[in-house]
């Protein structure tokens, strides 16, 4: 009986260690605060370091050339939270975009919900309206992700 109980405890502990952390806007690490050249929050290492570095480099150049502030968050789960609401709240909490021009862009990928969400600040909506964001998702991002690239 004691061995069975020990086996049960071991299995329970193993199951608990495999449980994914549910990310919230409050517990998500803001990598840009620690390093101004980083724009990709990838706490579960879903993206490879090479992919993360490549995106960081592109977004740094974009900000230097245009002033557009962007953050990309790649997460395994946000629990039952809505992707749009999460992305919107993340942009507000992290202050993505200049306050005067409100030119921020948040790109959120949540693997368990199979969700890609792009949220733009009001100052960016004229250049990047929802229709163009959706087209980018459908024509570029989703096929790329389906090919595991």
Locate the predicted segments by residue.
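Folded, non-transmembrane soluble domains that reside on the lumenal/extracytoplasmic side of membranes
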Residues: 20-149
